[in-house]
UniProtKB/Swiss-Prot annotation:
Quaternary structure (record): Part of the type III-B Cmr ribonucleoprotein (RNP) complex, an elongated RNP with Cmr2 and Cmr3 as the base, with Cmr4 and Cmr5 forming a helical core along the mature crRNA (39 or 45 nt in length), while the complex is capped by Cmr6 and Cmr1. The 5' end of the crRNA is bound to Cmr2 and Cmr3, while Cmr6 and a Cmr1 subunit (Cmr1-1 or Cmr1-2) cap the 3' end of the crRNA.
Organism for this UniProt entry: Pyrococcus furiosus (strain ATCC 43587 / DSM 3638 / JCM 8422 / Vc1)
Binding residue positions for Mn(2+) 1: H13, D14
Family recorded in the similarity comment: Belongs to the CRISPR system Cmr2 family.
Pfam families reported in the protein's UniProt record: Cas10-Cmr2_palm2 (PF22335), Cmr2_hel_dom1 (PF20822), Cmr2_hel_dom2 (PF20824), Cmr2_N (PF12469), Cmr2_Zn-bd (PF20823)
Protein name (Swiss-Prot/TrEMBL): CRISPR system Cmr subunit Cmr2
PANTHER family per record: CRISPR SYSTEM SINGLE-STRAND-SPECIFIC DEOXYRIBONUCLEASE CAS10/CSM1 (SUBTYPE III-A) (PTHR36528), CRISPR SYSTEM SINGLE-STRAND-SPECIFIC DEOXYRIBONUCLEASE CAS10_CSM1 (SUBTYPE III-A) (PTHR36528:SF1)
Residues in GGDEF domain copies: 592-752
A biological-process GO annotation: defense response to virus
Cofactor stoichiometry and binding remark: Binds 2 Ca(2+) per subunit, this may not be the physiological cation. Binds 4 Mn(2+) per subunit.
Residues reported in the UniProt entry to bind Mn(2+) 2: D14, H25
Length: 871
């Protein structure tokens, strides 16, 4: 378990302010640690970790008069260092350079007024502040988690940067007399200083995390993967099942990572980053984070650094913790199902639901595959990459430089970290296959009515008719699907939170605020009339199901909603139908379509490895490039960069995605670069575009964002279409349509009509912005001047017959054919404008030739007009 004082002197071997002044930075660490009564010591642990870390950042400093070039805020040469510039931060993916403008401005001003001693005086005050904050956080952790050193350390790790930022901001306002906004920027820059000012692609906290993680005996990279994912999620009949599936998978990964955190600390988790992670904050540190906990945001794969001698024990403990959690969840689900009439058996018969055949399904459903490889063992780096089939010309150039720096080709494995991750992935996938192959057969019997995969509870004991009669809605469930149904209840009991939209109908009715408008005018009357038909239709003065807003539901299918089968008054039902139809005439028919949005970062595996990140020279501070030997080779990633990217993805998924979706729909999953959301049709494109925009940013208020490309699939589908098939089609749009476009960064949008007609268009993200601001959009929505469905229909019907060399002329002909203004002059102007806009839009449509692009654009326009996507 964690020794908190040992953790701190390893972790704070460098001060958070290191980049302010490189010289004597270790002395500042001593002062900070002394505030917590911890003695600074550069032990073998620290030396080992620092040495391993340096293996991954390989360039050779050229000396100048036996001095080293230095980049810090001291602003002058001193001792063995000669100053070449102020620090910057280089984004680990986009390589965008960010300056520390507020710090520069303040330090320049102070130096000009008070001379060189100003920086040293400033550092004295800052070091004291860092020590005071550490002492405060240390005491808070000790008081909150008495005798629990693992949790004490986790609390310090999480909140020291947070509290330090708050302290620096107050310091900037009170001591430096900065205004609120400038003080906020000052603090943001201070807590995001680079770890290495020469190679500034990761922050100081990333370096401190990695050094602490590498300080264990025989540091070993461990990979965790939980499967199945898509089949488990896809086997969802209801939106609530879908949410429960995704959230439960995140909970299982949290349980796995909990073992790592207990034993070593949260900084040992490389991916996903646990800093600010809602599951970590809520379930490990007991923080009150509100409904943030309702978003599934932990992936099914993780990487961590552990001690090699502990790896086997960790594997056993992770598997046991997940297994025990699922079994306990199932036992609670059985109690809930019996008590709430989900399954109609006496309490005395409940034990039969806990027999071994059903428990075995729970134990064996998920495969938790864990593999590991030592980072510190030495091997011939050429041989390792050759054996793994990963050696190409770019890799060989990169290895050659590593060999030159260390004067040996036999190096610690961490030197080839990105290739090691690939090797570990390959080993892990092989192990997954082997372990899933070993699963035993289930008893013969009737299958679950939701997943169709597992034996239904009592499916081996009753004939089909009697089996159905035991279950609510005649829907027999297997142990895993029963867990899904119970899981929202369990989460609410642990967090006090409940998801807002339980069905796709809830989301569909958000379209143009239809439900809000209806409820304000007719809601009370509808509830009253529904209660007259049956009390089963009303609970807490609300309709029990949102599909009761549709007159078609009242005309057929009411019996399924009755708890007790009984005759209903058809006249009363007719009154409800007539009431609804009258309301529709006033405010319009209720929306029947909703959108599924799935998104995924492009080539993220290659981003993590560094294969698509350009040359090494792009990672080095511009002012120091004349003083270092830079290999002419691709930049291959480092553990530091992996941690930095992990944090950027966490910032994106935890903060930005949630902020964009807000109350627009239901955010099911936002983990790393993946997003799954259910949205009303009129918000789907807007939300998708905003999320892509956030993903493409490198920085937001000082915090890292991915700064990369993202592709998406949007399926617009009728609320009665089977959810599992809609999910499959949405993922097909992403994985087999958008992701197959060269260069990607593509949106594949599809409209699946109730009739079965299916329309698909592939476009670039900028098309959404261009179209939204176009005259064409206005005319399509107004349906004036002939610009409408007729125009779209004629182009789509005839485009495949157009001559390949006459596309522009045919487009002009169709515009002239369909566009009319109020007079000759307006008609001419309108035709020219719309033709020009169509040409602009075609620049953002994916296709192999002009005909494909025209078809793609007009299919997009058909989807827009038919589904009324834009408000």
């Amino acid at each position: 378990m964690v020794n908190i004082k040992e953790k701190l002197f390893v972790y704070l071997h460098d001060p958070p302010d290191k980049a302010l002044k490189i010289e004597n930075h270790e002395e500042r660490s001593k002062k900070i640690l002394s505030s917590g009564n911890i003695q600074y010591s550069r032990t073998d642990k620290v030396k080992q970790a620092d040495a391993l870390s340096s293996k991954t950042q390989r360039f050779i400093i050229r000396t100048k008069e036996n001095k080293e070039p230095v980049i810090d805020f001291l602003g002058r040469s001193s001792g063995k260092y000669f100053h070449v510039g102020y620090p910057v931060f280089i984004h680990p993916i986009s390589t965008e350079i960010k300056r520390y403008e507020t710090l520069e401005k303040y330090i320049d001003l102070g130096r000009s007024n008070r001379g060189e001693r100003f920086v040293n005086e400033f550092l004295e005050r800052v070091s004291k502040l860092e020590g005071d904050v550490l002492k405060e956080v240390f005491e808070d952790a000790s008081n909150k988690f008495k005798g629990e050193e693992s949790k004490q350390w986790a609390y310090i790790w999480q909140f020291y940067p947070v509290k330090l930022k708050e302290g620096v901001k107050e310091f900037a306002k009170s001591e430096l007399k900065l205004k609120e906004e400038e003080a906020e920027k000052f603090a943001e820059e201070f807590v995001n200083l680079p770890a290495d000012t020469r190679f500034p692609d990761h922050a100081i906290w990333t370096h401190l995390d990695l050094t602490s993680a590498l300080s264990v005996k025989d540091p070993t990279l461990l990979r965790i993967k939980i499967v199945p994912v898509q089949p488990f999620i896809a086997n969802s009949r209801k939106q609530l099942d879908l949410w429960a599936s995704s959230h439960l998978l995140s909970m299982l990964m949290y349980k796995a990572l909990e073992v790592i955190v207990d034993k070593f600390g949260p900084e040992h988790v490389i991916y996903p980053s646990l800093r600010d992670q809602p599951f970590f904050l809520k379930f490990y540190l007991g923080e009150n984070i509100g409904d943030e906990i309702l978003v599934a945001n932990l992936p099914n794969k993780a990487l961590a650094i552990v001690s090699g001698k502990e790896a086997e024990k960790i594997e056993e403990e992770i598997k046991k913790r997940i297994r025990d959690f699922l079994l306990q969840l199932y036992r609670e689900a059985v109690d809930w199902a019996v008590e709430n009439g989900v399954v109609k058996v006496d309490r005395s018969e409940k034990d039969s639901m806990l027999k071994e055949a059903y428990l075995k399904i729970v134990r064996e459903y998920f495969t938790v595959s864990i593999t590991w490889v030592s980072l510190s063992e030495k091997e011939d780096i050429y041989q390792v990459t050759e054996n793994a089939g990963l050696s190409d010309e770019d890799v060989k150039k990169w290895l050659k430089f590593a060999e030159k720096k260390e004067n040996s080709r036999v190096l610690e494995r961490i030197a080839i970290y990105p290739l090691l991750v690939k090797i570990l992935d390959s080993l892990g996938e092989r192990k997954v296959t082997e372990e899933r192959f070993e699963k035993s057969e289930q008893l013969k019997g009737w299958k679950c009515h939701v997943c169709g995969e597992n034996l239904a509870i009592f499916g081996d004991m009753y004939d089909h008719d009697n089996l159905k009669s035991l279950w609510l809605d005649e829907e027999p469930l297997c142990p895993m699907c029963l867990i899904k149904r119970y899981y929202p209840v369990w989460i609410r009991s642990k967090t006090g939170q409940k998801i807002r939209f339980e069905s796709v109908v809830d989301v569909a009715l958000l379209y143009k605020n239809w439900r809000k408008i209806f409820d304000e005018k007719y809601g009370k009357d509808l509830v009253s009339k529904a209660r007259e038909v049956s009390e089963d239709f009303v609970k807490d003065n609300m309709l029990v199901d949102s599909d009761l807003y549709y007159s078609s539901t009242w005309e057929s299918g009411l019996s399924k909603k009755l708890k007790n089968k009984k005759e209903i008054d058809e006249e009363k039902v007719k009154e409800v139908v007539d009431f609804l139809n009258a309301a529709y005439k006033e405010i319009g028919n209720p929306p029947k379509y909703y959108a599924i949005l799935v998104m995924d970062g492009d080539d993220m595996g290659k981003v993590i490895s560094g294969e698509v990140l350009g040359e090494i020279s792009t990672r080095i501070h511009p002012n120091i490039r004349d003083y270092v030997e830079i290999p002419e080779a691709k930049y291959y990633s480092t553990p530091q960069v992996h941690v930095a990217i992990s944090q950027a993805l966490a910032n994106f998924s935890i903060r930005e995605v949630r902020s964009v979706v807000k109350d627009e729909g239901l955010l099911i999953y936002a983990g790393g670069d993946d997003v799954l959301a259910i949205l009303p049709v009129d918000k789907a494109l807007e939300v998708a575009y905003k999320i892509r925009k956030e993903f493409g940013k490198s920085f937001e208020n000082g915090s890292l964002l991915p700064g990369w490309k993202l592709s998406a699939g949007i399926l617009i589908v009728h609320y009665k279409h089977p959810l599992y098939d809609a999910l499959e089609k949405a993922r097909d749009l992403l994985n087999n349509k958008a992701k197959n476009v060269p260069g990607k960064d593509t949106l594949a949008i599809g409209l699946l009509k109730r009739s079965g007609s299916y329309y698909i268009s592939l476009v670039g993200w900028e098309l959404i912005r261009v179209f939204y601001n176009s005259e064409l959009r206005k005319k399509l929505l107004e349906e004036k001047g002939g610009v409408g469905k007729r125009f779209i229909y004629h182009v789509l019907r005839e485009v495949d017959t157009w001559p390949k060399v006459g596309i522009d002329e045919m487009l002009k002909f169709e515009v002239i054919r369909h566009i009319r203004g109020r007079n000759k002059e307006e008609t001419k102007e309108l035709r020219e404008k719309i033709y020009g806009e169509i040409k602009d839009l075609l620049e953002h449509v994916r296709g192999n030739n002009e005909v494909e692009k025209v078809r793609g654009l007009f299919t997009f326009l058909k989807i827009i007009t038919d589904a009324e996507v834009f408000p």
